[in-house]
């Protein structure tokens, strides 16, 4: 998990992600997942560049099983970008910064 990301769970997923006026990148991961930590560091380095244009959130699938099930998360890390509360694109695995930027370009 990245230090600057908003922590989201089943209780606040709707308010932080689905009701957000900004596009939201959601990183679905787990504390035991090595690739998730690598992706989190990459995302943490990107957040400041999107300030005011997008939100970055982290969901621990063990802490938010309903959100993980709702969006069909079967492996971690999985990144989904949301616009107006609706998924607009996704990536699987610890992907590169350029791929994450391409994904965000769909919604920002």
What is the meaning of each model-derived region?
Residues 61-68:
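Structural microenvironment flanking redox-active thiols in thiol-disulfide oxidoreductases
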